[in-house]
Swiss-Prot record:
<comment type="function">
    <text>Cytochrome P450 involved in the biosynthesis of etoposide, a chemotherapeutic compound of the topoisomerase inhibitor family. Catalyzes the hydroxylation of deoxypodophyllotoxin to form epipodophyllotoxin.</text>
</comment>
<keyword id="KW-0472">Membrane</keyword>
<feature type="binding site" description="axial binding residue">
    <location>
        <position position="458"/>
    </location>
    <ligand>
        <name>heme</name>
    </ligand>
</feature>
<dbReference type="InterPro" id="IPR002401">
    <property type="entry name" value="Cyt_P450_E_grp-I"/>
</dbReference>
<dbReference type="InterPro" id="IPR001128">
    <property type="entry name" value="Cyt_P450"/>
</dbReference>
<dbReference type="GO" id="GO:0016705">
    <property type="term" value="F:oxidoreductase activity, acting on paired donors, with incorporation or reduction of molecular oxygen"/>
</dbReference>
<dbReference type="GO" id="GO:0020037">
    <property type="term" value="F:heme binding"/>
</dbReference>
<keyword id="KW-0560">Oxidoreductase</keyword>
<dbReference type="GO" id="GO:0005506">
    <property type="term" value="F:iron ion binding"/>
</dbReference>
<keyword id="KW-0408">Iron</keyword>
<feature type="transmembrane region" description="Helical">
    <location>
        <begin position="6"/>
        <end position="26"/>
    </location>
</feature>
<dbReference type="GO" id="GO:0009699">
    <property type="term" value="P:phenylpropanoid biosynthetic process"/>
</dbReference>
<dbReference type="Pfam" id="PF00067">
    <property type="entry name" value="p450"/>
</dbReference>
<keyword id="KW-0479">Metal-binding</keyword>
<keyword id="KW-1133">Transmembrane helix</keyword>
<dbReference type="InterPro" id="IPR017972">
    <property type="entry name" value="Cyt_P450_CS"/>
</dbReference>
<dbReference type="InterPro" id="IPR050651">
    <property type="entry name" value="Plant_Cytochrome_P450_Monoox"/>
</dbReference>
Amino acid sequence: MDSLHCLETLLLGFFVLLPCFFYFVWKKPNNKIKEPPQPAGAWPIIGHLHLLARGDLPHKILSSFADKNGPVFKIQLGVHQALVVNNSEIAKECFTTNDRFFLNRPSGVAAKIMGYNYVMLGVAPYGPYWRDMRKIIMLEFLSNRRLQSLKHVWHSEISISSKELYKLWETQNIDFCLVDMKQWLADLTLNMSVKMVVGKRFFGSASASACEETESSNCPKTLRNMFRLMGSFVLSDYLPYLRWLDLGGHEKEMKRTVKELDILFKGWLDEHKRKRLSGGKEDDDQDFMDVMLSILEESKLGNDVDTINKTACLAIILGGADTTWATLTWALSLLLNNPNALKKAQDELDLHVGRDRNVDESDLVKLTYIDAIIKETLRLYPPGPLLGPRVVTEDCTIAGYHVRAGTRLIVNAWKIQRDPLVWSQPHEYQPERFLERDVDMKGQHFELIPFGSGRRACPAISLALQVLPLTLAHILHGFELRTPNQNKVDMTETPGIVHAKATPLEVLVAPRISPKCFV
């Protein structure tokens, strides 16, 4: 009976509040104001949410809306309006002329819980704290000087992982050994990110010692849970009055995961503090957590310094590992499905590097086809097909339309980068298009913005553009690659914050360079 009474009360409250909801959220706009078009099919209360849950991926559904409604339109996501941009010129307008209006991220359950109450840089509101933290990360982790000092980390990880792959082939004593390259790349990129940030390695023969075995097994699982949860759909982000129900159990799982992460990062932080007290490290040997300890000694950032350190390190690991892994997995998948492109890449490596030594960073400037492969991969499979959402802070005008404060901005990079008005045969894999077309990926050429643009663009663009070609070149140079039975690679995608391949990437692998390169 108590449950029935509670239900009656909820229903009464619902019908009392429903007219208010329609008045404030669905009221007709001023006829003098030109507003963006809106796709048909919105329902009361939930808006267009049901259309985004029809089985296809959100960026593809929004692309189909653009085909019918034009390159810019608005949709209703529960209590929130969103402006969806599907055109490079309009994206340019958002990220240049009007960038000052799009500097905030939307609030949400994941941002609050897993972002340590919005302390993490990627979800922090725009203001003095965000500006100061971004400056610290850019200077102390992503500056040319710091990247130069960190190069040995990714060189070492690529070398170690390649040697382990060679040993696997050697141990099996067969022409080709079968490897899930998706998992291999996930292990490599997570090792790389964690090593740069906290000096740890978790996979392979050179990983943690026996006393760290539990930590070594728990860390990857917990971090990948966080990757998944940060990109999960939480209904209460769009219908806040349902949060108390925790439909789907996301909030409970987020709290459990962030608690596990906090224990992990606190242990690392305490370890770094102990080493610091016992004499510390030379500047060139310091990882990012060491650097942050020094900087935060005299911090005036307005938050608990340990929380700032943990969230800064977590943000870099999250931002680096999964996006790099996903891009490299797509790059290999596309090459395996296009053997002529794979042969061209390996011929280029043989010409400029040979088969008696490993690829060096100094070789990359000559490897123009490898560079074109990276660009074409990021064009077809951007790490985040929908760029990180933003919130309009003031009323503004975009593409001639009035956009109200509080509206969310969704930029469909996937659609922009397949625009037939910009790209010939936009859905075809053609790395050659970038041999004659001078386009960079740093956010200034708006037809190719896989890392975003404006002040909220991914700060680690420079790091990604060094690690991606070097890693891919090492793999293609070091190993012959083919699919079992010459089958096509399954290119099914997963939903989520990172645009990842849904299925394993099973590849037959054999060395193609001198064995001395793996010693």
